[in-house]
Amino acid sequence: MGVSGSKGQKLFVSVLQRLLSERGLHVKESSAIEFYQFLIKVSPWFPEEGGLNLQDWKRVGREMKRYAAEHGTDSIPKQAYPIWLQLREILTEQSDLVLLSAEAKSVTEEELEEGLTGLLSTSSQEKTYGTRGTAYAEIDTEVDKLSEHIYDEPYEEKEKADKNEEKDHVRKIKKVVQRKENSEGKRKEKDSKAFLATDWNDDDLSPEDWDDLEEQAAHYHDDDELILPVKRKVVKKKPQALRRKPLPPVGFAGAMAEAREKGDLTFTFPVVFMGESDEDDTPVWEPLPLKTLKELQSAVRTMGPSAPYTLQVVDMVASQWLTPSDWHQTARATLSPGDYVLWRTEYEEKSKEMVQKAAGKRKGKVSLDMLLGTGQFLSPSSQIKLSKDVLKDVTTNAVLAWRAIPPPGVKKTVLAGLKQGNEESYETFISRLEEAVYRMMPRGEGSDILIKQLAWENANSLCQDLIRPIRKTGTIQDYIRACLDASPAVVQGMAYAAAMRGQKYSTFVKQTYGGGKGGQGAEGPVCFSCGKTGHIRKDCKDEKGSKRAPPGLCPRCKKGYHWKSECKSKFDKDGNPLPPLETNAENSKNLVKGQSPSPAQKGDGVKGSGLNPEAPPFTIHDLPRGTPGSAGLDLSSQKDLILSLEDGVSLVPTLVKGTLPEGTTGLIIGRSSNYKKGLEVLPGVIDSDFQGEIKVMVKAAKNAVIIHKGERIAQLLLLPYLKLPNPVIKEERGSEGFGSTSHVHWVQEISDSRPMLHIYLNGRRFLGLLDTGADKTCIAGRDWPANWPIHQTESSLQGLGMACGVARSSQPLRWQHEDKSGIIHPFVIPTLPFTLWGRDIMKDIKVRLMTDSPDDSQDLMIGAIESNLFADQISWKSDQPVWLNQWPLKQEKLQALQQLVTEQLQLGHLEESNSPWNTPVFVIKKKSGKWRLLQDLRAVNATMHDMGALQPGLPSPVAVPKGWEIIIIDLQDCFFNIKLHPEDCKRFAFSVPSPNFKRPYQRFQWKVLPQGMKNSPTLCQKFVDKAILTVRDKYQDSYIVHYMDDILLAHPSRSIVDEILTSMIQALNKHGLVVSTEKIQKYDNLKYLGTHIQGDSVSYQKLQIRTDKLRTLNDFQKLLGNINWIRPFLKLTTGELKPLFEILNGDSNPISTRKLTPEACKALQLMNERLSTARVKRLDLSQPWSLCILKTEYTPTACLWQDGVVEWIHLPHISPKVITPYDIFCTQLIIKGRHRSKELFSKDPDYIVVPYTKVQFDLLLQEKEDWPISLLGFLGEVHFHLPKDPLLTFTLQTAIIFPHMTSTTPLEKGIVIFTDGSANGRSVTYIQGREPIIKENTQNTAQQAEIVAVITAFEEVSQPFNLYTDSKYVTGLFPEIETATLSPRTKIYTELKHLQRLIHKRQEKFYIGHIRGHTGLPGPLAQGNAYADSLTRILTALESAQESHALHHQNAAALRFQFHITREQAREIVKLCPNCPDWGHAPQLGVNPRGLKPRVLWQMDVTHVSEFGKLKYVHVTVDTYSHFTFATARTGEATKDVLQHLAQSFAYMGIPQKIKTDNAPAYVSRSIQEFLARWKISHVTGIPYNPQGQAIVERTHQNIKAQLNKLQKAGKYYTPHHLLAHALFVLNHVNMDNQGHTAAERHWGPISADPKPMVMWKDLLTGSWKGPDVLITAGRGYACVFPQDAETPIWVPDRFIRPFTERKEATPTPGTAEKTPPRDEKDQQESPKNESSPHQREDGLATSAGVDLRSGGGP
C-alpha cells in the first residue's frame, strides 16, 4: 500500500466501507479496524508493499488460511472471512484496480476524499475511456507516480476543475454504478467454510466490454513525449462509447489531458503490438501493465540488470510487440545511466549486424532506420506502422543487448537486509532467502553455499542458538528441524536439561538435532543414566547389570568396612577425635564440579540460609579470605540460579551489608575461573558510605550457566582512597546504588607487627623488614649464604647507631618479587638481627606511603612514587642493529669498568640486556683520580635523526629585569634522572669483557640518557621544560630562565620568588628530577652560566689566560674561541685583537707550529686589563635603550646602551668579501644589533646612533642599497651623536671612515695614465708624455698584473691624475678600498694592502675610469688603451703554432704555411705532440687522384668506428681531385642511410659528374640508381672484392680515424657528431699540401693556369714511346698526359714518363718526382710494335687495353 500507521489504517477503513456500501453492505468502523489489524498481523508486508488488487488479495487469503491451520479458526475474527470474500469478488470484477501506490506519500483529508471519489466510482474518466476507463485512470496515476520516481521531476499538476462541475460528474458516475449493480444483482455473503474451500489459484477474470480504444489511445499519445511502454492490441473494432467531458485529472494524467486539448497526440505513452487475429491488422492500443514495469525496475535496482529473475521479467516484456521507441524508453526508465549507454550501444551494433546479414535475403524489407527508429521512422507514430517481422527483429536485438550488459555481482546489500524476524518461522525465512538468492544467481553449488551461510548469519538469535552446535556439520534440513519449535522457553529448557545431565549445551543440542530423525542425534538417543548415546535408561546395561562393590576399610576412622561418606565415628581406632565429616558439594559425585564454594560463612547453616529474608545480614568483617595470600574478600551466592543469554544482567544476592571500614572503598571484580564456565561478572565500586546489601552483577556469556548456593563468584577488594576537594552532591550515599569515591590505591594497614616481606635473591628466598629509612638493602649475616662471595668496604653505615665491619656482595644480585625484578648490590652486616629491604628495592616494587590526611598522603606519594615519565622517543633512520665488538681492556681499567657498572646498576641507571646492538665502552681517569665510564656511541648516533638544538644560544643574565630578586637552582645528575624511552634502551647496550674469555661477556643497556648520545642534550631540555611548565603557567608574571640543568627564577618580590622556588622543587621532584639544595643561590652575588651577577651589574667570572702552552694552531684556536665567548662583556675591538687573529693565518694543519708575536703579546696584555674591569648592566625594560655604532679602527664596534653598556657587539675578524667598505660594516652591525636586541628583549632598540653626519647618512641612503635594507622596519630614531660617557670617548681617535681622496669625476688638470695587465704576468703603465713602464712576473695572475700596473701609477705620480683601464675589477676597487678592510685570505692581499697605504699617503685626489678594450674606435683614450694593451702581448708565432696544434693536430705543412715558421719547427711540433707520432708521418696529399678538376669524380664508402656506439657506421665521400672529404655518422648502411648521406654531401660539396663505389647491396639498389639518375650523376662500381679500385677513399678512412683518435685523446667531446665534425674541419680546412693549399681551397678555389710541362710517355699497349705531350698532373706512382692527337687524357704509371728536353742534360720538370728514364736493357730495346692508340673514354678519363687504370697506385 505504501501508507502505514494511523493514516494507512484510516485510508483502508474508508476504502473498505465505501466498497461494501456500494454493494449494500454496511460494516462497523470497529470491525473494519479489527480486520485491518488482523490483516497486518497475518500479512505484515501489506501496508508497505501490497495493494487492493486481485493478486495481492489472493496472497492475503493464502496467508489467512495458513494462519487458521496453525492457530485454529477461533483465532480469526468472525468478520474476517466475509470481508475478504466480498473484496475478492469486487476485485475480480474490477481486475487491476490499484488504490494505493508503493510510492504514495502521506495524504490529507481533502486528498483522501478526492482519491476515493475518482477511484471508487465509475468516474467520468470511465466515460472518457469507455468501459475500461478505470483501468486507464489507474494507468495515468501509476505512470505519473512512477515517472516521478524515475526522473525525480514530477509533472506539474493542472488546476482542478470547478467543485460544482466535479460534484455533477460524481453524481452521474454513481448512477451508472447503481445501474450496473441492478443488472448483476446482489452478491450473497460467503461464510468461513466457503472461504476455506476457495480455489486460491483461480486467476481468471470475467471479460468486459471495451470502448473505441483507437480513438481513446489517440487522445493519450504524444509524438514528442514517451515516458513508459504500454502494449497495443490488434482486435476488431467495437462500437464507439459515449464521450462526456472528463474531470480535470492531476499529475501525468493532467499533462495528457492538456496535450489532448491542444491537438493530435498520437503517442502519449508507449505501446506494445499484440495481434489476436490476422484478419484485421488495425492497431488498437492497450496499456502495458505498470506492475510489470515496476517489477522490472525493482529487479534491476535490487538484483542487477543481468540477474536471472530480471532476465525473466525482460522476457515477459519481450513477449509483446514493442517499437524501438518503446524499448528505449523502457531501458532508460529502468536501467542506470551507465547500463543504459551499454544497452543502447549493444542494440545499435546488433541492429547493424542484422541489416548486413539480411542485405541479400530481405532486401528492401528491413533497414537500419526501422530497427533504430531513426530517419523517417524517428517519430513514434511512424514506428507503429512497422510490420511484425521488423518488430520481432527489434525485440530480438533489444533482448540480446539487454543480456549483454555485464553482471554487477551479487547485491550484498539486498541479502544483508534479508533477516529473520523475531516472530517469523525459520522455514518461512528460508523460503524468502532461497527466492532472493535464486533471483540473483542460478541454482548450483555457489548459490547453495551462499544460502547456507546466510541461513546462519541472518537468522534471529534464538535460531542461531539452536543451529550453532550443528552449524558446520548440519544441512539446511537439519537447520529447519532444529528451529521447528524455536522459542526462548525451549532454549532455556534445553539449557536446564543439559545442566542437569552434566553436559555442555552444544553437546546436548548436537545429540538432539545433529542430523538424526525424530529429534534424536546422529548416534541415536542418549541415556539419562550413563550419559552415553545409542540407548535409553530402561535399556542401560550399566544400571541393570552392575551393582556397587562392597566398601573397603574406612579411610576416616580405619575401624570398619563402610563408605567414608557413611562414617559416623567420632574417634579413630587410636581414640583420637575426628573432625566433622564434610558434606559440601565437592563430596557429591553426582553433581557437576564447578567453582569451589567459599569457606563456611556465618549464616550458611542458620535458618532460612540465603533464601530467608529473616536471616541476619553479614558484615564486611564476616567475609573470609580464600587463602592467606588472597588480595580480596570472597563474595558467595546465597541462592541457586540458572542464567541464560536472554536473562541479561542479573543481581546475585550475597547478604553482605555495608558500611565498609573507615577510609576504604570497595572494588568488586570477578574470578578468572568464572569466565571458563561462561559467567561474566561486571565490576562495581562500593563507596565507603554505602549501607545497603552488596549484590554482584552477573550475566551469562554463553547459553545457560548454573550458580550454586554458596559458590564463590566474586572478590571484594578493600582499597584506601584520597579524598579530593570536589563538590559533593549528597552528604551520604546510604543504601543507594554503586558509585565511586575518588582515587583508589592498594594498601596494607600499619599495625604492631613488623612489615615483613619475602623476596627472592638469585633464586633464594629471603625474609626482610621494609625499612623506608634505609638507603640501601642490608642482608643479615645469618641469612647470607656462605658460598656467596663478599668483600670488605672501608665505609661504615650510620643510622641510630653505627655498624662496623660492613661487607658488600662481590657481584650484583637479581631480585624478584611477584612480576617485578631488578638488580641490587646489597651490603652484608654480620650483627644485623634481620634483613632490611631498603629504598633501592622498595622503589622498584612500587611501595607507597599513605596517611589519613589527604595533604600528607599526597606529599608522601609524590616523593615515594617513581615517575613513569620518559624522554621522547628518538627517531631512527634504520632499525638495522649496529654491533661493534668490545675491545680488550687492561686489568686496571677492567676493574674500574666493573665497579662503575655495578654502581650504575645499583642506582638503576643500567639493566641487563640481550639487545642485538652493541658499542664499545672504556674508562678514563680524571684529574681527581676517579674513573669515568664512557661509551663510543658514534655508530649509534649515525643511525638516528638529529633533533636539533632547542636553544641555539646561551641565555644572557642582562635580560633579567633590573632590580628583580633572583634565585638560581641546579639539577643534580640531570641526564641520569631522565629515563630513556623503553623502545630506545636496547640501542645503547654494551658488553663488559672477560680476560681470556673466562666467562661470557656481561651485557647491559642504559635506562637513562647516556652521555655521548648526540640527542641527549635536546631530550634533557625538553624533559625539564615539560616538568617546569606548570610553574611557568602558575607564575606568568615571573621571569624563569632554563638552560640544561640550570634554572634561574626572578620576580620583583622576594617572598614570591621564594614561593616559586618551592613550587619549582615540587614540580621537578614530581618528574623524578632532583635539586641540589647545597647549590641553591639566592638574591645576590650569584654565579650563572659563567657570569657573576652582583646587584644590577653582570661580569664574567675570573678568567686566567695561560700563554705557556700556546704552541700549535689548535692551541691558538681554542684561545681565540674562549675570547670570542667573553667578548660581549669586554670593550675589546676587533682591531685590538687583530694581531692574535693573524696568528691563525698560514698552514691549516692543526698541529702546525705557531708563536706569539710582540703585537699579539700586547693584545693579550690589553685583554687581561679589560677583563678586570669588564662590567655590563642589566636592562630596565620600562626605559628606552639605544644601539650605538662606534667608530673603531679596522672595523666598527657596537653596543646596546642604557645608562651604560648592556652588551658589546663585535664583527668577525675576517669578512667573507675580499674588500668590504667601512660603511658596509656599519650596516652589518645595525642588522646584528637589532637582531640581538629582539633576541634578548623581544624588541627593537629605541634609538640607533651612527658614526656619520646627517649629510653623509643621507648620501649613504641614496647611494648604497645596504643602508635602507639595514633599517627596514625600524620605527625608532637615528641619532648622530654618541651618549656623553667617558667609556665611549676612545672611539673619537679613529679617522677615515668615509672616502675623501677618490674623485667620482675626471679631474680637469689631471695627468692621463693608461694601465693594463695580462695573464702572462706583464703589466704596463703608460703615463702621458713618458715612456711606458713594463714589469714582468711570470708568477702573477691577470688580476695581480692589473693591480701592479695601478700601484706603479700611484708610486710614479703624486700629482692629480686620471687613470683609465679596461679592467672592471680594478675600477670596482675604488672608492671602497680607501676605507675598506681587506681579507687576508685572498692571494692579492699584499698588493691590495700596499695600494691602500699609497692611497692613505696621498695629498692629491685622483680619478679611476673604465674604458672598453679592443674596440678599434678613434680617439686619444681608445688609442692610448690599445697601445697599452699591445705592449702586454709577448706571444710568438711558434707559441701560436703550438697552441693551434694542441687544438687541431694538423700536419706540419699547415703549421708552416699558417704561422710562417720553418719546416723544421713545424715538424718538431708534430713530433713532440703526444698524440700525433703514434700515427706516423702523414703522406703527401694528391696521391692517386682520378679527377682532373673538382666535382668530376667522387669515391664513396662506409667505414666502422666502434667508439661511436650505435653511430658506428661512418659514410665517407671524397673528391678524387681536391681530396675534399665529407662524412656522416649513422646507425646503419642501408639504402636510406646512403640516400641521406648523399643529400648532405651535395649540400656540402656540390654535385659531381660521377660517383664510384664498391658493389655493396645498398649502392647497387634500384633506389640509389633512380636517385642518381634524377640528379644526372653517373655511377660506376669497381671490381668486386678488389679494394684497389677504392684506394683514395680507403686512404681517407685511415686519415679520418687517425684524426679522430688524435682529437679524442686531446679533448672532451660530447657526441660522436661533434668529434667527427672537428676531424673534418681539420682535414678540409686546416691541413695543407706542399704548395700551402687546403682541400677546401683546392675544391672551391680557381683552377691553376700555370703552363703544363711537356713529357715523353710510354704506350702500355704498344710498348713504344710517344710525345712530347702535355703533362696534366703527376704524383707518386701516377701521371696523366694529354696526347696532342687524342680527345681525352691518358693515365700511365709515373715510371713510364720522361721529361722532354732539347738537351740531354735538361732539368727535370717539376712534378715528375725527379724521375729518370729506366736504364735497363729491356727498356732500351723496346720498340713500338703496336701503334694503335689507347681506348678513349667520354668522361675525360682513359683506359689502356680495356683496363681501368684508376684503381692503380695506392699510397
Swiss-Prot record:
One of its GO terms (cellular component) is viral nucleocapsid. The active site is at D771. InterPro entries: Aspartic_peptidase_AS, B_retro_matrix, B_retro_matrix_sf, DNA/RNA_pol_sf, dUTPase-like, dUTPase-like_sf, dUTPase_trimeric, Gag_p24_C. Its EC number is 3.6.1.23, 3.4.23.-, 2.7.7.49, 2.7.7.7. It catalyses: DNA(n) + a 2'-deoxyribonucleoside 5'-triphosphate = DNA(n+1) + diphosphate; Endonucleolytic cleavage to 5'-phosphomonoester; dUTP + H2O = dUMP + diphosphate + H(+). Residues 151-169, 178-191, 1716-1740 have a biased composition (Basic and acidic residues). Residues 1307-1437 form the RNase H type-1 domain. A zinc finger (Integrase-type) spans 1436-1477. Zn(2+) binds at H1445, H1449, C1473, C1476. Nucleocapsid protein p14: Binds strongly to viral nucleic acids and promote their aggregation. Also destabilizes the nucleic acids duplexes via highly structured zinc-binding motifs. NC-dUTPase has dUTPase activity, thereby preventing incorporation of uracil into DNA. Belongs to the retroviral Pol polyprotein family. This is Gag-Pro-Pol polyprotein. It comes from Mouse mammary tumor virus (strain BR6). The gene is gag-pro-pol.
